[in-house]
């Protein structure tokens, strides 16, 4: 029979199905299984943190330990065959509790603790190991270092025996307990020894069996060699005990299962009854058997590593020293009195602490009403109750414990006090900010100017008065922490910072409004300048007011408009900022940002005008105005005798000069870029990174940009200039060709002798028309119609309409003829004969070889290529 063969052993593979029933932690050769962490992950225990419990079971071999665990926790540990007596469990095995929910018809409220892990330890006193007790001692030490509860499985008839009742095993447990936990005397982690008495008949009361076992345990404890200072310690200082009896599984199966069901209800979280606590802090356990003091405080995700390290030290016979903390027994009474004094204190203060914690967790600190009187009364009563009970003890211990009690109380009260001031601080700052914003909005709605600085001063005074009133009401007399001057100073500084932030926000909004105004003004002004650039007419074609401005000074005019607009904006900004109580540094930063932002607005507008489509349109308009209109702004009507080439050349060359002019932002007066770097100025020393993060880098101004002022003022690159020149010339050539055609279009090349011949041969017809009033009137009407058609330039549309009508008439005639032939017998016969001839010709053509066809195809393609070349030409 394979021991626990359906579990994941240390040599098993990585298949998750092998973890379904558990895992072997340590095999019979004392090797630790590295797959324990995978099993915990498989059972979803790893993310549980401290929310898990570990139980180990001890007992003699073949006493039904695995059977007990399987029935109690729904596990699947292998059990011994009823037909033979031999070792079943080898090493240490681990499985998670599978019985999560109790039967709700028994106890609807009962529920076992989450993530209960059960370790089945190899039985003792087995013939397989014989006299070798090394593994027995090592497994006991391992279980005690990791487990909260140690279940001792014994039979009723073994009670009172030494070996049969596992007293040798328990002595080992006590010895390793001293070895494990007494090296660090700061604390004493407790463990629970849970005796499960099997085959319990009830003849001997369970209480009597319990007394017998406790007497044996105390006798074993007394026989142990204890460290110095702990000679008088008792077993109850380190262990709690619990007892349960189970009927015979085979003779009373139903009753056995009922008692197992009842027993399972005890495996949940419990607590000690406060009324039964003794001087050592122990007492009866209520609820479940899992107490916080039993837990080893090892997170679930690190348990496998922790257990492996513990076993490595144990198996290599190294000293196992676990960090613990313990209070001295001499201080228990004072600690008990202190706890009793804190009970009433907790009742008064805990509600305020809970409310404050909930408010902090929700992110909305709340000023608690009535906190000051409650703190003063609770502190006074707690100290008085402690003095009454503890003043009879040793003065030094009494004073030390009183100081500790006061420190505990003051620590909690100080936390409440600081939390109250923090809530008053945060709510006060928030109310201050909201009040200032509301007052500013009210002033804006009225449409009148408001004094921002006066609003801030008034609201700041009200906020400080409210904070001081709340702080005074929370003070506790005689408390060393009862001083709020530091918090008041921090509050005032925070109000000052908030005031500065509100002022900066208001100045940002002011700057945004001014920037919008600058954008609107610059947009209109620059549009007018570039629109004037598109008109090359003079005389009556000049602007409505004044003469047409010179094209060469366009950048001078744009720069002047820009500087004047920004100066006006700076004046508006400075006047409005004076009411904000802003310092000179803040105003300087605002003006500096305004100049940079304004340049960005101008540059964006210029880039928009310099877009290829817009620029080509303006160049064409400029050229056409110079070519189609004379100096007086009168449209030109071209005649064959006009010098079109000269006018074209002058207009084209004049327009071409605009491309290099517009390529760079350069003043005509100085023949250099405008002094942008001097105009913007250096970065103010008070400017913060937040003031610069939304600014666009400017070449020649920002050293980090890597661009010079010349590059910043370059609007069109060389490649784009050449492309614009070529495209403009093509456009101008088209206008020139159109003008040339219009000039020569009216010339008729008719020989003079044709008119004499026409007059001689048509004399009779002329006389007939002149003598006949009808013909004469018809001729007169036709002449009038032809003249009107010519003046309205309708000859072209009339000719096109005539051609379209004639084409439609031909198509309609073909359709009618086809319908006639299809309707008559003669026509159908003729169409059939024509179809037969076509089929014969197609059959004969299909018999031709591919080579002539290919030659013909190449010839046809060559002909098509020639036709295409002719069309292109």
Swiss-Prot record:
Coiled coil (UniProt feature): 482-506
Family designation: Belongs to the TRAFAC class dynamin-like GTPase superfamily. GB1/RHD3 GTPase family. RHD3 subfamily.
Record: residues binding GTP: 59-66
GO molecular function: GTP binding; GTPase activity
Protein name: Protein SEY1
Topology with respect to the bilayer: Multi-pass membrane protein
Pfam family, one: RHD3_GTPase
UniProt source species: Ajellomyces capsulatus (strain G186AR / H82 / ATCC MYA-2454 / RMSCC 2432) (Darling's disease fungus)
Function summary: Cooperates with the reticulon proteins and tubule-shaping DP1 family proteins to generate and maintain the structure of the tubular endoplasmic reticulum network. Has GTPase activity, which is required for its function in ER organization.
Gene it is expressed from: SEY1
Membrane-crossing segments per the record: 750-770, 774-794
Gene3D superfamilies per record: P-loop containing nucleotide triphosphate hydrolases
Lumenal side: 771-773
């Amino acid at each position: 029979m394979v021991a626990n063969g359906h579990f994941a052993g240390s040599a098993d593979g990585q298949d998750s199905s092998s973890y379904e029933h558990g895992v072997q932690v340590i095999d019979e050769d004392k090797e630790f299984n590295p797959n324990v962490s995978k099993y915990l992950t498989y059972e979803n225990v790893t993310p549980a943190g401290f929310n898990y419990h570990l139980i180990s079971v001890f007992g003699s071999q073949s006493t039904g330990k695995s059977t007990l665990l399987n029935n109690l926790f729904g596990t699947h540990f292998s059990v011994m065959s009823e037909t033979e007596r031999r070792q079943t469990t080898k090493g240490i095995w681990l499985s998670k509790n599978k019985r999560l929910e109790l039967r709700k018809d028994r106890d609807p409220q009962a529920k076992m603790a989450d993530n209960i892990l059960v370790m089945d330890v190899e039985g003792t006193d087995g013939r397989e190991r014989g006299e070798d007790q090394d593994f027995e001692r090592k497994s006991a030490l391992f279980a005690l270092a990791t487990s909260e509860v140690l279940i001792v499985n014994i039979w009723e008839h073994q009670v009172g025996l030494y070996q049969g009742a596992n007293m040798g095993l328990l002595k080992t447990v006590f010895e390793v307990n001293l070895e494990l936990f007494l090296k660090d005397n700061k604390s004493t982690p407790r463990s629970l020894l849970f005796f499960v008495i099997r085959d319990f008949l009830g003849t001997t009361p369970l209480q009597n069996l319990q007394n017998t076992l406790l007497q044996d345990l105390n006798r074993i404890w007394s026989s142990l060699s204890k460290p110095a200072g702990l000679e008088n310690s008792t077993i109850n200082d380190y262990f709690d005990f619990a007892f349960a009896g189970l009927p015979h599984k085979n003779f009373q199966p139903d009753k056995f299962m009922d008692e197992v069901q009842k027993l399972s209800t005890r495996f949940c979280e419990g607590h000690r009854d406060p009324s039964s606590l003794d001087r050592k802090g122990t007492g009866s356990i209520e609820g479940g058997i899992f107490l916080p003091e039993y837990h080893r405080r090892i997170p679930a995700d690190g348990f496998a590593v922790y257990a492996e390290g513990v076993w490595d030290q144990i198996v290599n016979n190294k000293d196992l020293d676990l960090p613990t903390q313990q209070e001295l027994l001499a201080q228990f009474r004072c600690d008990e009195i202190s706890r009793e004094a804190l009970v009433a204190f907790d009742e008064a203060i805990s509600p305020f602490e809970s409310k404050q914690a909930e408010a902090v967790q929700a992110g909305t600190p709340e000023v608690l009403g009535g906190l000051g009187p409650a703190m003063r009364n609770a502190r006074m009563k707690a100290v008085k109750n402690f003095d009454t009970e503890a003043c009879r003890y040793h003065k030094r211990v009494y004073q030390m414990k009183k100081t500790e009690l006061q420190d505990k109380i003051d620590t909690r009260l100080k936390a409440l006090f600081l939390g109250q001031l923090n809530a008053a601080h945060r709510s006060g700052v928030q109310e201050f900010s909201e009040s200032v914003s509301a007052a500013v909005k009210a002033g804006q709605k009225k449409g009148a100017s408001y004094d921002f600085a006066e609003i801030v001063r008034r609201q700041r005074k009200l906020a400080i008065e409210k904070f001081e009133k709340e702080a005074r009401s929370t003070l506790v007399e005689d408390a060393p922490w009862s001083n709020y001057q530091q918090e008041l100073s921090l509050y005032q500084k925070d109000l000052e910072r908030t005031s500065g932030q509100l002022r900066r926000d208001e100045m940002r909004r002011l700057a945004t409004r001014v920037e919008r105004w600058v954008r609107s003004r610059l947009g209109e002004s620059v549009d007018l300048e570039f629109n004037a650039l598109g008109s090359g007419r003079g005389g009556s074609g000049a602007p409505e007011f004044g003469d047409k401005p010179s094209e060469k000074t366009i950048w001078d005019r744009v720069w002047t408009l820009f500087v004047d607009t920004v100066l006006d904006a700076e004046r508006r900004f400075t006047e409005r900022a004076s009411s904000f109580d802003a310092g000179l540094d803040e105003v300087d930063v605002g003006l500096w940002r305004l100049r940079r932002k304004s340049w960005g607005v101008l540059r964006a507008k210029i880039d928009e005008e310099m877009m290829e489509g817009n620029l080509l349109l303006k160049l064409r308009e400029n050229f056409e105005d110079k070519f189609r209109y004379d100096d007086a702004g009168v449209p030109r009507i071209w005649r064959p005798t006009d010098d079109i080439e000269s006018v074209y050349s002058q207009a084209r060359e004049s327009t071409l000069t605009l491309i290099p002019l517009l390529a760079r932002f350069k003043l005509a007066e100085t023949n250099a870029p405008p002094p942008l770097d001097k105009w913007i100025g250096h970065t103010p020393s008070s400017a913060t990174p937040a003031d610069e993060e939304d600014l666009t880098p400017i070449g020649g101004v920002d050293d980090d940009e890597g661009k010079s002022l010349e590059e910043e003022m370059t609007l069109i690159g060389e490649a784009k200039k050449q492309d614009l020149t070529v495209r403009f010339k093509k456009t101008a050539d088209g206008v020139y060709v159109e003008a040339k055609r219009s000039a020569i279009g009216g010339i008729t090349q008719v020989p003079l002798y044709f008119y004499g011949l026409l007059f001689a041969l048509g004399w009779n017809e002329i006389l007939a028309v002149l003598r006949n009033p009808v013909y004469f009137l018809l001729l007169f009407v036709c002449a009038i119609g032809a003249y009107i058609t010519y003046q309205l330039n309708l000859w072209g549309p009339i000719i096109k309409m005539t051609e379209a009508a004639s084409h439609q008439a031909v198509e309609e005639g073909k359709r009618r003829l086809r319908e006639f032939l299809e309707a008559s017998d003669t026509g159908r016969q003729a169409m059939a004969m024509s179809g037969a001839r076509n089929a014969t010709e197609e059959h004969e053509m299909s018999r031709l070889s591919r080579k002539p066809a290919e030659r013909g195809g190449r010839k046809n393609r060559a002909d098509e290529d020639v036709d295409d070349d002719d069309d292109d030409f």
